[in-house]
Amino acid sequence: MGVKGLNQLIKEHSPHAYKEFELKNLFGRKVAIDASMCLYQFLIAVRQSDGQQLTNDEGETTSHLSGIFYRTIRMVENNIKPVYVFDGKPPVLKGGELEKRLLKREEAQKQIDNLKDDASVSDMTKYQKRLVRVSRDQNDEAKKLLELMGIPYVNAPCEAEAQCAELARGGKVFAAASEDMDTLCYEPPQLLRHLTFAEARKMPIDQITYKEAIQGLDMTKEQFIDLCILLGCDYCETIKGVGPVTAYKLIKEHGSLDNIVKYLQENPDKTKYKVPENWPYNEARQLFMKPEVLPALEVELKWKEPDLDGLIEYMVKNKGFSEDRIRSGAEKLKKGLKAGIQGRLDGFFTVVPKYSNTSPLGKDDKKRKTNDKKGAAAKKTKRR
């Protein structure tokens, strides 16, 4: 579900935390991708002209495999090394959100059943997209394809976005890639959005720098997590009527969710906001503060040469894809992976910022400048 309104708040208070660029600007980077979110996007977006998902002759859905295969190749061709991270067992607190999603799918099915025979393709597609969920079989199929492509994947013990953030924090990858803004609650140095969107959509990639985001909001890590819970996350409902502006104001005024809850409960006559009964906000906070993840140091990532014979057997003979296209894709993949990361200059050197004539100098800089002048004067005296 993500965090409602967080994008808006960061853009307003921390515009410097945002960057937009093209895929090629990630040249030489390793990126951890939220696979479950990625597959969900492919099942929705990769469709035939009549709005139906891609299927093979046996009627099996193949949209997710097409998406993984071609988008991964596109990244590798741009000298990006992706690693896909799959969800593990969801936290107990997420049960309520999962139940809501199930109810929405059931409602969408009712709408489809009630559509008349002459219903438009767009109406049918709209409700069909609401039925989409990533099955266990589809996850397994994607893993098999990645293995044959030589692309590493990680099975997270719990939430995929938390594991992506852990890999980024641990230096295994440059950034976490997910559409879910709650990924920022797990402190990835960088969050990438729209990375796996279709090229035809011409959507730039968003990069959000975590440290700059919370600095602009003038919040601690704990306050940022409290803000996200107040805005609404997957783990618990929010306080009815509290939107982004009010949530930000409450955190700034009271300092923490604990103080906000206490104030609202002790002053029911002074506010229209009611705290939900038995609201598990503290449990939600702990899931963000101490997520269940594999330590980055224990995760080994290896990119290998694709198994062409295996790809032909699986994608062509089993899944009905065009052999010419799979061979062509495999060749591009092989070429891209063989080239490897040719290197970014900032990967080999520590970039030292230059001081401009207009930039203020700190105390240490002023001392250094004074000492440099003294040293230069001494050299002139010696030369004389």
UniProtKB/Swiss-Prot annotation:
Its cofactor is Mg(2+). It is found in: Nucleus, Nucleolus; Nucleus, Nucleoplasm; Mitochondrion. This is Flap endonuclease 1. Residues 123-254 are annotated as: I-domain. Residues 354-384 are annotated as: Disordered. The keyword Mitochondrion applies. Its main location: nucleus.
